[in-house]
Regions:
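Hydrophobic alpha-helical segments
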Residues: 1-175
């Protein structure tokens, strides 16, 4: 059972419901926002930030989804690991590809750029102090400075809010 009460949609702030398209999402897709809805103004800011990360994204959806799923594994966020986002699926994310994330550096169906981004995400999630000049030099082989900043902000979002979601223990809707 979740450790924070999930608000029913009827109890959400009207603007937050609209911003998040909550009425069209499944409970799994609504995710932690069901708890965040207790603080609607803060949640609107979070939604705006998350929306900006997605709407202004220059990185491929496939790469972002691969990094998200690998970070979710390290966060041990069961709901984060269970969900599959449509934009990632439309950009080539399959369950076979997801299985490659068990040992991503050995996977032959991941590009070198994807492996570099996944490695960065893994280190950010597990040992951020190990992210050194060599890691950034490797990222620069595949990504511009602005793409590296975008990746960094996206990974920070995944790590922080994935851990928060894991701590809420939202497992009721999991397959």
């Amino acid at each position: 059972m979740s450790r924070i009460k999930k608000l029913d949609l009827d109890d959400w702030d009207k603007d937050l419901r609209e911003m998040t398209a909550a009425d069209s999402g499944t409970p799994l897709e609504q995710g932690a926002m069901r708890m965040f809805a207790h603080t609607p103004e803060i949640s609107k800011g979070l939604t705006a930030f998350a929306g900006s990360l997605k709407q202004n994204r220059s990185l491929p959806d496939r790469l972002v989804e691969l990094v998200r799923l690998r970070v979710a594994f390290h966060n041990q966020c069961r709901s984060c690991m269970a969900i599959r986002y449509k934009d990632g699926q439309e950009d080539g994310i399959t369950e076979d590809l997801v299985c490659s994330l068990e040992k991503p550096m050995e996977a032959d169906n991941l590009s070198d750029a994807e492996k570099a981004a996944i490695q960065y995400g893994e280190l950010f999630a597990t040992n951020h102090l190990a992210i050194n000049d060599g890691i950034y030099d490797n990222l620069r082989k595949y990504f511009s400075e602005s793409e590296i900043v975008e990746l960094s902000m996206t990974v920070a979002f995944f790590v922080g809010f994935g851990r928060l979601a894991a701590s809420y223990h939202m497992v009721e809707e999991l397959p």
